Regions:
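Nucleotide-activated donor-binding/catalytic signature segment of Leloir-type glycosyltransferases, i.e.
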Residues: 244-260
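A short, active-site helix/loop in glycosyltransferases that binds the activated sugar's phosphate group
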Residues: 138-163
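Conserved acidic donor-binding segment of nucleotide-sugar-dependent glycosyltransferases
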Residues: 311-322, 330-336
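Short His-centered aromatic/hydrophobic patch
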Residues: 91-98, 115
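N-terminal strand-loop element at the rim of the active site
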Residues: 11-12, 16-74, 150-153, 237-238
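A charged, aromatic-enriched C-terminal amphipathic alpha-helix characteristic of glycosyltransferases
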Residues: 336-367
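A conserved mid-protein helix/loop that constitutes part of the nucleotide-sugar donor-binding site
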Residues: 23-34, 198, 202-221, 238-244, ...
């Protein structure tokens, strides 16, 4: 597969545009950048500085240009300058895509956008998001959706060319000596107060779209179990104080852990992974990590969950805390079902795209858009 510009004089130069607000898309861009650089593509990642601090795009061989997560004139001008002489621009997420549309105004540079999830908003902001979606979909040369639902949405919104994207779960990046410093699961469980009781884990920013309210409502049911399961939630966000008040006021068996950099280790120590709401995330990172780690998953049917996990999880209707609570209780009481889900999860995960396949698909789109077209 080619990695050269249409003129064959120098290697293809791409600009990846990222808002930095979504862990899944940020990890995807890091993985994509590493794969493209390894294939001879020059990659510039335009993202907030904190995103590079976390995901180390420069360590993947890309150039990082700090562009704030904003559509103000200064940010758009910085992005426009970074896109000068780019063979193509690839933006990830709705807001980053809209900034790219503004920055490329008047230029003929091909624009690829990947929709990793569906943006959520209410009231007047919801109307604004629909307008942004329409502008981005109609302007982009190609829209890649990470689920068939997102591809259909892009087409309905006016995309000229919408395709299903192969998006792999990037392998965890380990720092030197990381394995030696990993605490055993028993130690983590003891630190969390989960010895002699089931440990359930959820991950996600503490906002209104992650289903944490449903999770707390379900936890009321679990108070009556013996032993009482402990639910831990890794993540931070604007609803933390409100959720903590409910936990304290109702004495719920839930701990908010805040931001953690050991989510993989916590998940390996858990008996169940819980996904009470997708938050618009089409390919839930937690769901993928749970199946890879052979941790049974209970999830609500939101976003692209069924398409992602198939029959390898307990799936319940959204907005139904009683059904969610019952599914958790059933699974904790049925070790044979839990073991079956582990095996089904391993099988399901084996069919997901690899990082190499993800890079190959993206590079084929790049080549399609930058290679000279035959004269007819």
């Amino acid at each position: 597969m080619s990695s050269h510009s249409p003129h064959g004089q120098s290697s293809l130069r791409t600009v990846q545009v990222l808002g930095g607000g979504n862990a899944g898309s940020s990890a995807h861009v890091r993985s994509l950048a590493a794969g493209l650089v390894a294939r001879g593509v020059r990659v510039t990642v335009c993202a907030p500085g904190e995103a590079d601090d976390t995901y180390d795009f420069t360590g993947a061989g890309a150039e990082h240009v700090h562009v704030p997560r904003s559509s103000d004139p200064g940010s758009v001008a910085a992005l426009r300058a970074a896109c000068t002489d780019a063979d193509l621009v690839h933006a990830h997420g709705l807001h980053a895509s809209f900034r790219a549309v503004l920055a490329l105004g008047g230029r003929r540079t091909p624009l690829i956008v990947t929709w990793h999830n569906r943006a959520h908003a209410e009231g007047a902001r919801a109307h604004l998001l629909r307008l942004l979606e329409r502008r981005v979909a109609r302007t982009a040369t190609v829209v890649l959706g990470t689920t068939s639902d997102l591809v259909d949405r892009a087409r309905r919104t006016g995309a000229r060319d919408a395709r299903l994207a192969a998006v792999a779960l990037p392998r965890p990046r380990r720092t030197e000596g990381h394995e030696e410093s990993e605490p055993p699961p028993s130690k983590l469980r003891a630190e969390l107060g989960a010895m002699g009781r089931p440990l359930c884990m959820a991950v996600g920013s503490l906002d209104g779209h992650r289903g944490h309210g449903l999770l707390l409502d379900a936890a009321r049911v679990w108070r009556g179990l013996d032993p009482v399961p402990l639910v831990v939630v890794a993540g931070e966000g604007p609803q933390r104080a409100e959720l903590q008040r409910q936990i304290d006021g109702e004495e719920l068996p839930v701990r908010l852990l805040g931001r953690r950099d050991d989510v993989g280790e916590l998940l390996a120590a858990a008996d169940l992974a819980l996904l009470p709401g997708g938050g618009g995330e089409s390919r839930s990172v937690l769901a993928q990590e749970a199946l890879h780690a052979r941790v049974p998953l209970v999830a609500t049917l939101t976003g692209g969950v069924r398409e992602l996990v198939g029959d390898a999880a307990e799936l319940v209707p959204p907005h139904d805390p009683a059904a969610f609570a019952a599914a958790v209780v059933r699974l904790l009481d049925d070790p044979e079902r839990a073991e079956l889900l582990r095996d089904l999860g391993t099988r399901q995960a084996a069919g997901w795209p690899t990082e190499d396949e993800t890079v190959a698909q993206v590079l084929s789109v790049y080549d399609e858009l930058t290679q000279p077209q035959p004269m007819i």
